A protein has these predicted regions:
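Alpha-helical segment proximal to the catalytic Tyr-Lys
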Residues: 28, 72-76, 135
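Short C-terminal tail/terminal secondary-structure segment
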Residues: 48, 127, 138-151
Length: 151
């Protein structure tokens, strides 16, 4: 947390405020339809502390709590809210991590599946949560990390 408050505010704005704004835009229509599914992409960072990514992890923990609160408040309107907490996924966002051999080796050493995730592995869970198969899943965080958080 040793960072200027302006940087902390930017992380919170990018990761929390933006989700709040988007949810407030879609929730009235979902309430009117008495149906809907909100899926927020969080991170395994939201499940643990960090001596490097403190503000990011705090914002991702807030994503997880936002989902729980939306689920509690709007469940009566048949609106579900869930989050997905990915580990290291082969995306442009995380490219600096998976392209760095030392970081990649450290991540793989702590991942039972010995690989990083692929974007379609996140997309598949998002599709399930938004589909009929996910109609009774509400307020949950689904971790997709190859087992990193279990060891």
């Amino acid at each position: 947390l040793d960072m200027p408050i302006e940087k902390f505010d930017k992380v919170m704005s990018n990761n929390i405020k933006s989700n709040q704004i988007l949810c407030n835009l879609v929730l009235p229509d979902m309430v009117e339809r008495n149906d809907g599914s909100i899926i927020i992409i969080s991170s395994i960072g939201g499940l643990k502390g960090s001596n490097i990514l403190g503000a990011y992890n705090i914002s991702k923990a807030a994503d997880i709590m936002m989902v729980k609160n939306i689920a509690a408040e709007f469940g009566k309107n048949n609106i579900r809210a869930n989050s997905i907490a990915p580990g290291l996924i082969k995306t442009d966002f995380a490219k600096a991590l998976w392209e760095n051999p030392d970081i990649l080796k450290a991540v793989l050493g702590n991942t039972p599946m010995q690989r990083i995730g692929e974007p379609d592995e996140i997309a598949g869970v998002a599709v399930m949560l938004a589909s009929k198969a996910g109609e009774y899943i509400n307020g949950q965080t689904i971790v997709i990390d190859g087992g990193t958080t279990i060891v």
